[in-house]
Amino acid sequence: MVITKTPFRMSFFGGGTDIKEFYSEYGGSVLSSTFDKYCYVTSRFLPEFFDYFSEFVYSRTERVTDIDKIEHPLIRNCMKFMNLQNIRLAYDADLPARTGLGTSSSFAVGMLNAFHALKGEMCNKKELADEAIYIERVLCNESGGIQDQIAASYGGFNRIDMSEDGYQVKPIILPKQRKKELNDSLMLFFTGFTHMSSTVQNGVKENFSDKIRRLQTMKSMVDDAQNILIKGSHLSDFGKMLHETWKLKKSLSSIISNSDIDDMYQSAIKAGAEGGKLLGSGGGGFLLFYVDKDKQKYVREALKNLLYIPFNFENDGTRIIYYDE
């Protein structure tokens, strides 16, 4: 039996520049961090005396006798890619799926990590990220970028640069107290809405040539945000930049936000938030705000109908927390 633990991520700047149509020509950059909310994948070989060859437990339970009959596309393609059968797999998570935290990619990375361990194989972080990207984007044919798989695999607070030739993961090195100050100034709220990121990504790709300049601006903001963090500028400038990138992001597609989300956002700004954004591709999920500590109680009151999620940054990425041959 193998149990893996894989973090979710929050993307601050550069989201959208990690889609192949953009980074292969212009280069992409993302500033993101994983945090201490996780998905857990428990996997083991299933004895052959059952009347089904594999069982998968997630939001529903599947018992199948043929790999092609697995309904969950990610599980089906991971099983085929790893050439596995007679598997029992269970998925658990701290936060719901389809909420802009890279949950499906964390599942993919955690599942691959577990499957490799079941086969007695060591697999490094880059291999896991590359395999998850291939399975989600090629085998599952889902629209989207590549930052989520990289973040889930590597973990930590990173700048990820992407080009036609590949990607580089560069840790953002900050004094412990400054990183804590940033962490303590960020507030996460669940809107109650979920979304399919591939649907939103398809909306972004419509009339894509008209959006190149805005994506280039969003990419340049990664440099600006990194400079704020490492050069000792006031961290409230980071919050103000979140507001600017959110405005740009909304302009990419009409389905990224809606009137309810806009109202929530404006309520937080009026209560004292410097800025914020909807995490992930858009359409629902989690709102992240930068709020000075003395104003956080007012923002919580303004958004009292939303679930507030305290969190801490994490550095480990996917890992095996239980292994028994």
Language-model segments: residues:
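N-terminal pre-triad scaffold of radical SAM enzymes
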Residues: L89-A97
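Short aromatic-hydrophobic micro-motifs that form the base-stacking/packing surface
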Residues: T99, K277
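Glycine-rich active-site/cofactor-binding loop and its immediate structural neighborhood
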Residues: G284
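C-terminal nucleotide
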Residues: V2-F13, D18-E21, V30-S32, D36-N83, ...
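Short glycine/proline-enriched turns and hinge-like loops at secondary-structure junctions
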Residues: Y23-E25, G102-T103, S143-G144
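DPxDG-like acidic metal-binding loop motif
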Residues: L101-E121, K125
